[in-house]
Amino acid sequence: MFSGIRIHYALNILEAHGITPFLEFCKRAQAKKGVGVKDLFEIDANFTQALSLAKVAQSNGIEHSKIPKLKEILNSVPGKALIFTSYRDSVNMIHSQLNEMGISAGILIGKAGDTGLKQKKQIEVVQKFRDGEFQVLVATRVGEEGLDIAEVNQVIFYDNVPSSIRFIQRRGRTGRKDTGKLVVLIAKNTIDETYYWIGKRKITAAKSMGSKMTKVLEKNKDPSVKTGLDAFI
């Protein structure tokens, strides 16, 4: 059961993020002691073959089909861009790929245990982005809220989240003062696509609830109309 969960999670990373994040996850998982670890990395022939093929792909410079698309998108719209991804290993991989393309980029990740950026460092990175020291900022969830990130010309979702709130927060980082562009990268028939539609449905449901609440509040302005909680259902 535990091995099955690991395989499922690893597959999602491989499909939605890329070869390097997948291999980094496997490296950490293999170092852990627990039920199913040996079975997964030494006995399961299918998984060991997948791991071997991933290493060959990495050595040949293969990462994910999103990467060349990312380059195309960044080159099509001049100005600053903010790239969101939920996975830290993806941040490092994307940053490395952008540097190889000659695109100046910075990293913004949260602090977790002994890894990540402390708040002071996060603020420094954001300020450098605002000052134009680099044109692209690759961020995890910490970039979605809290920090005062400068206006950007486009926001790119490298992955998708099944949350209407996080979708809106990500999207809200562009188009504040002028027209901005939003690009959502989706690996077809993967968790990416599933999360995208879950998030969209939740946004639609939230808008519907907001509309109902507005109508009820307008009715309540009339003292002769009494409305209970049933009106929201």
Describe the function of each predicted region:
Residues 1-96, 100:
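Helicase motor interdomain insertion/brace
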Residues 65-73, 121-125, 142:
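Well-ordered alpha-helical segments embedded in enzymatic catalytic cores
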Residues 110-112, 116-117, 134-135, 141-177, ...:
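Conserved RecA-like helicase motor core of SF1/SF2 enzymes
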Residues 130, 171-203:
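Conserved segment of the helicase C-terminal RecA-like domain
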